[in-house]
Swiss-Prot record:
Keyword Amino-acid biosynthesis: yes
An annotated GO BP: aromatic amino acid family biosynthetic process
Species whose genome carries this gene: Neisseria meningitidis serogroup C / serotype 2a (strain ATCC 700532 / DSM 15464 / FAM18)
PANTHER family: BIFUNCTIONAL 3-DEHYDROQUINATE DEHYDRATASE_SHIKIMATE DEHYDROGENASE, CHLOROPLASTIC, SHIKIMATE DEHYDROGENASE
Pathway membership: Metabolic intermediate biosynthesis; chorismate biosynthesis; chorismate from D-erythrose 4-phosphate and phosphoenolpyruvate: step 4/7
Entry function: Involved in the biosynthesis of the chorismate, which leads to the biosynthesis of aromatic amino acids. Catalyzes the reversible NADPH linked reduction of 3-dehydroshikimate (DHSA) to yield shikimate (SA).
Domain of life of the organism encoding this protein: Bacteria
Any GO MF annotation of the entry: NADP binding
Catalytic reactions of this protein: shikimate + NADP(+) = 3-dehydroshikimate + NADPH + H(+)
InterPro entries given in the database record: Aminoacid_DH-like_N_sf, NAD(P)-bd_dom_sf, SDH_C, Shikimate_DH, Shikimate_DH-bd_N, Shikimate_DH_fam, Shikm_DH/Glu-tRNA_Rdtase
Name the record gives this protein: Shikimate dehydrogenase (NADP(+))
Length: 269
């Protein structure tokens, strides 16, 4: 009996990951059977865990917190997106035994905004809240969509300035944000503790979309605040999660899943 193609997601913690359910839905669309497992790698043991997985026949892996930067250094070669982001969320085994690193987070975000939410990015003004790895990972792909302006706001200005200089965008301290933005994207993790970024409510007055990169309950504080402050449309990061997974699946298997039915399936779970 032929073994099924094996895929995985590495993280710590990783028990909460919805990636196995998402990728099984993609496999149903393709009409194939796959295995997809969660692997909780020890801090300090990520490289060995990845090596063991691929040496025993692994066909592809996703990488989540806190290993995306380590995965970048582990990969033997990188896509342009991964190089720009300085982080890897997708590992692809090559025929020569090496690993290629890619970053599909930005594709997941922009496909959700433009294809599922039907909001154009080109010519729009975008505010990014936060300056961590999640935000850094999506800036290169956002820029490809040619927005009129990208502003990054962070609690500590130095970190925002660092990303602004790296990517040729603007930076402001969180408390000094003013003016209207078409799209406001929250990349801070405060929602996990019920907190919202320290921003004035009037910045949402002309906001076509307020988007939180996390999904579920963790997105609720920010999205409620945005809605009450005048944002026309709000969305959590479930579509981004499914979108980045679909891009990874396509890199591994050469099959591009339709993300819309999978987003609806995950909402119903």
């Amino acid at each position: 009996m032929t073994a099924l193609p094996r895929y995985s997601v590495f993280g710590n913690p990783v028990a909460h990951s919805k990636s196995p359910q998402i990728h099984q839905q993609f496999a149903l669309q393709e009409g194939v059977d796959i295995e997809y497992e969660r692997i909780c790698a020890d801090i300090g043991g990520f490289a060995q865990a990845v090596s063991t997985f691929f040496e025993t026949g692994g066909c592809g892996a996703n990488v989540t917190v806190p290993f995306k930067q380590e995965a970048f250094h582990l990969a033997d070669e990188h896509s342009e997106r991964a190089l720009a982001a300085g982080a890897v969320n997708t590992l692809i085994p090559l025929k020569n035994g090496k690993l290629r690193g890619d970053n599909t987070d930005g594709i997941g975000l922009t496909n959700d905004i433009t294809q599922v939410k039907n909001i154009a990015i080109e010519g729009k003004t975008i505010l990014l809240l936060g300056a961590g790895g999640a935000v850094r990972g999506v800036i290169p792909v956002l820029k490809e969509h040619r927005p009129a302006r990208i502003v990054i706001a962070n609690r500590t200005r130095a970190k925002a300035e660092e990303l602004a200089q790296l990517f040729g965008i603007e930076a402001v301290p969180m408390a000094d944000v003013n003016g209207g933005f078409d799209i406001i994207i929250n990349g801070t993790s405060g929602g996990l503790n019920g907190q919202i970024p320290d921003i004035p409510p009037d910045i949402f007055q002309n906001c076509a979309l307020a988007y939180d990169m996390v999904y579920g309950c963790a997105a609720k504080p920010f999205l409620d605040f945005a809605r009450q402050s005048g944002a026309k449309k709000t969305a959590d990061g479930l579509g981004m999660l499914v979108g980045q997974a679909a891009a990874s699946y396509a890199l591994w298997r050469g099959f591009t899943p339709d993300i819309r039915p999978v987003i609806e399936y995950m909402k119903a779970m």
